[in-house]
Structure formats: C-alpha cells, structure tokens
Amino acid sequence: MIGDQKINHVSRALLLAPFIFVCHFLEESPRFVEWFNAHVVRGITSGLFWRVNISALAITLIVVGIEWVSRSAFSLSLAIVWLSFLMLANAIFHIGGGFVDKKYVPGLATAVLLYVPYYSWVFMKAVKSERVKIMELVVAAVLGSILMLIHGYLILFRGSRLF
C-alpha cells in the first residue's frame, strides 16, 4: 500500500505538467519569435513556434497519460527524460538568456517561478517513489536535457540553432 501511495503521488504531480507548460507558453509567445530571431541567423516563423509548442503540449499529454496508466519504472523514466528536455533545460536556456542579454527574455518569469520549482518537486517525488534508482533518474535527466542545452548554447553563444 505504501508503494502504491508513493507511485500515485508522483503520477498526480505529473498531471500539472500540461498546465505549467501552457503558462510558460502564454508568457513567452507574444515576443519569443522576435527575441529568438534577434539571436540567430536562421530564424523561425510564428507558425513554426506555434507548431513546435502544440507538438510539445501533445507529447506532454501523452507522456503524462502513459505514466498515469502504466505507473512503471519505464513510464516514470520517460516522464523525467521529457520534463528534463521541456522544463529543466528550457529553464536553464531562459535563465542563461537573461544573463547574456542582461535583461528580461520572453519566458524567463515562468522558467524561474514555475519550471524550476515544479521540475525539482517532480524529480524529488520520483526519487521518493523508489520506482527508479536515483542514478537512473539522473541519467534520464542528463539524456533528456542534453539536446536542449546544446540548442540553447548555440542560440545564445553561436548565433545558430540545433533544430
């Protein structure tokens, strides 16, 4: 019974992920494309920005659904991989962008106020669930975040992008 409660707590916590993502999207959407295109040679369109974010929301809903139905080591690891890409690395990107630009960048407020605390909370719930070993969760977080971290580095410091 205690194991089921631990599993259920992390599953319930993940239900907030789509809402937190939408809050972040709403904050960054009015000015992100303009900000992004000021940093890279190969810019993006508003349409691409919307498609990427709608796809990210769909993936988030699928990942949360898989966790809710499965509640397995795989589903929890998948959730950590995805949230590490979507929230952890994205938050680092927005915070880094704020330091590089020395001013507010679109998405910075929700990255700091929602993404960082929410991701930390979910990660700790995942650890406490004891469903996946902590080292495996750390590896999942690194693997999930690496592409977005490289992408962010290229944008902020090289004027290019990975995808």
Regions found by a protein language model. Give the residues of each.
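Membrane-interface helix caps and helix-loop-helix hairpins in membrane proteins
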Residues: 73, 95-106
